[in-house]
């Protein structure tokens, strides 16, 4: 699996509390453990105060297992076990445009000054979720390119 330019975020609302990691990766299933290769490039994994470690990695057995975070922001107290990392920032608030708990208003575009700006690899896709082109060279992390 190869995930590019993902923004994965979870925030509590007045009705629901955020209490589980936004990403859980495991090579175990109902029929036992299997091979796993997953690469996350130019991604953001973030949540509010409900969870300290937003990424959970679980390896079972002795099968082939590779999880790699390449240019990413993780809300994480420490690097998860069983992963490789390249240019990963831990606990660097990505500064989303709006995370308004009271009004249940969320906008995961990046503010100016976000540590995610210009920190990605030039790997594509060529456009963000709004249809805006991504520049050659250092792209923003996440699914939106700041305009």
Question: Where do the protein language model's features map onto the residues?
Answer:
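Predominantly extracellular beta-rich ligand-binding scaffolds that present long acidic/polar faces
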Residues: 1-109
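C-terminal accessory segments
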Residues: 87-147
């Amino acid at each position: 699996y190869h995930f590019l330019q993902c923004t994965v975020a979870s925030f509590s609302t007045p009705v629901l509390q955020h209490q589980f990691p936004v990403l859980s990766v495991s090579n175990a299933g109902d029929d036992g453990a299997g091979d796993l290769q997953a690469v996350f490039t130019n991604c953001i994994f973030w949540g509010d105060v409900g969870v300290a470690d937003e990424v959970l990695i679980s390896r079972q057995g002795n099968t082939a297992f590779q999880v790699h975070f390449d240019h990413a922001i993780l809300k994480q107290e420490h690097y998860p076990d069983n992963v490789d990392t390249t240019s990963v920032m831990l606990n660097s608030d990505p500064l989303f445009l709006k995370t308004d708990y009271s009004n249940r208003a969320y906008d995961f575009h990046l503010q100016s000054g976000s540590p995610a700006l210009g920190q990605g690899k030039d790997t594509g896709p060529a456009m963000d979720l709004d249809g805006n082109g991504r520049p050659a060279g250092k792209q923003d992390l996440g699914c939106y390119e700041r305009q």
